[in-house]
Amino acid sequence: MTKAATKQVEEFTAEAKKTMEEGVEKMAKGVEDVTSFNQENVEAVMTSGKVFAKATEAASAEIIAFSKKSYEDGMAAAKEISSVKSVSEFFEKQTAFAKSAFENYVSEATKLNDIYAAAAKDAFAPMNDRFTAATDMVKAYKA
């Protein structure tokens, strides 16, 4: 083989080696990026789960407190109604209790709705961030 041919083979080999090393580095970086990305996804799911757990805990406490108050209000109303002296007084007290119970129920439903709406917003925020990150990652690899 001539010196020129040997030199060409050496240059080709060096270029192939360089290209292969760059490819391996890019692949390793890609694997590292995917691993990191997946870890961040797991953390986002865990964060969302914690938010929902706290919201469920808050809602449960609210429901228990409401149930206790409703029971106490019902017992007080029953006691008050049992001491009425006339049919009209009975209907007045019964109507007042029903109105109060309904207003309390609507208020409680609003509180629970607020708890769950805030939880949904807060819990989905990390997932939305991960979706944005995934979109950005795909755009970066396409570029």
What kind of feature is each model-predicted range?
Residues 1-143:
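Amphipathic, low-complexity, repeat-rich surface-exposed segments
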